[in-house]
């Protein structure tokens, strides 16, 4: 069974902030000591760290839940609780991280050591020392810690290779990779010998080097999931140059030109941008008897279907078995790579905008709905944040929360919707009566 895994869905939960403390200074010779409760510590973030030693997402096959520690509670003497350590999760180079709910790309991790916070820890709640005022010098008010961010993520590994080998099954991609690199892919005289991508490094006679990926053979309908389908088509996306391998011996009764058209159709159907990558046509198995005649026919059909002003793709006849033409092919590939820039994998519409947490006057602070039992239901990100950080065990904290609701315009909005004195209002699992 293959141990290669290139997709995974996981859940991450950052740590909650520690609760603030209500405490008072009681020391001999210090009359009217005042508040002395400290703030809670910050919750730990969940951080992805790129590790070049990893080659697969196999670590996420059985471990799909990642939870960072919460911050410690505030202490007496105004001391802060200790902040939690970040939970650092290693991922391989080439990992794309998406929000599973929205489908938006959060980050594309390609550099060794690159870090990205996928879930932010909650800030610590404030202790009562923070709420002292001339009017209320000894407040019994504290905040709960802010809940840590929680989300479901879709991970997708797209291997880092400069050059991708594509073609129908059994055209000789694995054989080619084995003779131009030190990679040892599985080679056999049957279809789909390669069932996972293989990666190898090429070094040309002139000393240039580049990474080559041998991808599992494509068949018609691959972009719709036929055969190995799109399972490995994603790995072509990071390549800058495509070597299109064609079996010129036509040993299985196939038409090399029809094969060429069919594979390009699958690449275009999967992702139109793949056709922006320059292609080199590699006609393999030229050591076979019928290959030269088939090559001439292939060139003729190719020329007939290209506009006179279009530049025909470069064609390199080779034999992976006898190594005929390999040096010329590799030099041409290196030269093409030198003048081919990186391709943008995602545009701005694919990426999730970076969120800055702060007050936004245009942000809708709360929403009002009505349940089937006639209870008014309050929701909204800003309102729920205040609710979760309120310590309902302290009367002063409850009154502070009521003032915050009035300040946000909740009372006026409820009246405008028709709420009457004594109506039930629910926030989360907490219910109270509306007082007009």
Swiss-Prot record:
Single Gene Ontology MF annotation: GTPase activity
A GO BP entry: ribosome biogenesis
Sites where the protein binds GTP: 167-174, 192-196, 214-217, 284-287, 319-321
GO cellular component: cytoplasm
CDD domains tied to this protein: Obg
PROSITE patterns, per the entry: G_OBG, GTP1_OBG, OBG, OCT
EC number: 3.6.5.-
Binding site for Mg(2+): 174, 194
Domain of life, per lineage: Bacteria
Keyword entries, A-Z: Cytoplasm, GTP-binding, Hydrolase, Magnesium, Metal-binding, Nucleotide-binding
Enzyme class: hydrolase
InterPro entries: G_OBG, GTP-bd, GTP-bd_Obg/CgtA, GTP-bd_prot_GTP1/OBG_C_sf, GTP1-OBG_CS, GTP1_OBG_dom, GTP1_OBG_dom_sf, OBG_GTPase
Main location: cytoplasm
Occurrences of domain OCT (ranges): 358-436
Chain ranges of the Obg domain: 2-160
Cofactor(s) needed for function: Mg(2+)
Pfam families listed in its UniProt record: DUF1967, GTP1_OBG, MMR_HSR1
Subcellular location: Cytoplasm
Residue ranges annotated for the OBG-type G domain, each copy included: 161-338
Role, per record: An essential GTPase which binds GTP, GDP and possibly (p)ppGpp with moderate affinity, with high nucleotide exchange rates and a fairly low GTP hydrolysis rate. Plays a role in control of the cell cycle, stress response, ribosome biogenesis and in those bacteria that undergo differentiation, in morphogenesis control.
Protein family (similarity comment): Belongs to the TRAFAC class OBG-HflX-like GTPase superfamily. OBG GTPase family.
Subunit structure: Monomer.
PANTHER family: DEVELOPMENTALLY REGULATED GTP-BINDING PROTEIN-RELATED, MITOCHONDRIAL RIBOSOME-ASSOCIATED GTPASE 2
UniProt-recorded name of the protein: GTPase Obg
Species of the source: Streptococcus pneumoniae serotype 2 (strain D39 / NCTC 7466)
Gene: obg
């Amino acid at each position: 069974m293959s141990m290669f895994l290139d997709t995974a869905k996981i859940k991450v939960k950052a740590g909650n902030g520690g609760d603030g403390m209500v405490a008072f200074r009681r020391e001999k010779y210090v009359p009217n000591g005042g508040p002395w409760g400290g703030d809670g510590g910050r919750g730990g973030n969940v951080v992805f760290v790129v590790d070049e030693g990893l080659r697969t997402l196999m670590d996420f096959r059985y471990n799909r839940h990642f939870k960072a520690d919460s911050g410690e509670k505030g202490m007496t003497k105004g001391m802060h609780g200790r902040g939690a350590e970040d939970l650092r999760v290693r991922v391989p180079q080439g990992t794309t991280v998406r929000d599973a709910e929205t489908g938006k790309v959060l980050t594309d991790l390609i550099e060794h050591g690159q870090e990205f916070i996928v879930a932010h820890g909650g800030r610590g709640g404030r202790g009562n020392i923070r709420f002292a005022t001339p009017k209320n010098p000894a407040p019994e008010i504290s905040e709960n810690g802010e809940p840590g961010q929680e989300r479901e993520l879709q991970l997708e590994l797209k291997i880092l290779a400069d050059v991708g080998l594509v073609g129908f099954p059994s055209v000789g991609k694995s054989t080619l990779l084995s003779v131009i690199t030190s990679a040892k892919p599985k080679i056999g005289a049957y279809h789909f010998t390669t069932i996972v991508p293989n990666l190898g490094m090429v070094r040309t006679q002139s000393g240039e080097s580049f990474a080559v990926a041998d991808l599992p053979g494509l068949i018609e309908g691959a972009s719709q999931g036929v055969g190995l389908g799109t399972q490995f088509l994603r790995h072509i996306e990071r390549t800058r140059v495509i070597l299109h391998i064609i079996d010129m011996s036509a040993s299985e009764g196939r038409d090399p030109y029809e094969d060429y058209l069919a594979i390009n159709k699958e690449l275009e159907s999967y992702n139109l941008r793949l056709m922006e990558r320059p292609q080199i046509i590699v006609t393999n198995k030229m050591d076979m008897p019928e290959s030269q005649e088939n090559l001439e026919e292939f060139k003729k059909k190719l020329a007939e279907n290209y506009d006179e002003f279009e530049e025909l793709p470069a064609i390199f006849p080779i034999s992976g078995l006898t190594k005929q033409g390999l040096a010329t092919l590799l030099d041409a590939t290196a030269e093409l790579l030198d003048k081919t820039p990186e391709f943008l994998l995602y545009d701005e519409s694919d990426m999730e905008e970076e969120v800055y947490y702060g007050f936004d006057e245009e942000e809708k602070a709360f929403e009002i709905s009505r349940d089937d039992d006639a209870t008014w239901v309050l929701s909204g990100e800003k309102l729920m944040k205040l609710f979760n950080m309120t310590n309902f065990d302290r009367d002063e904290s409850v009154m502070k929360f009521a003032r915050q609701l009035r300040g946000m315009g909740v009372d006026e909005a409820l009246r405008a919707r028709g709420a009457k004195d004594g109506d039930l209002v629910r926030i989360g699992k907490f219910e109270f009566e509306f007082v007009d």
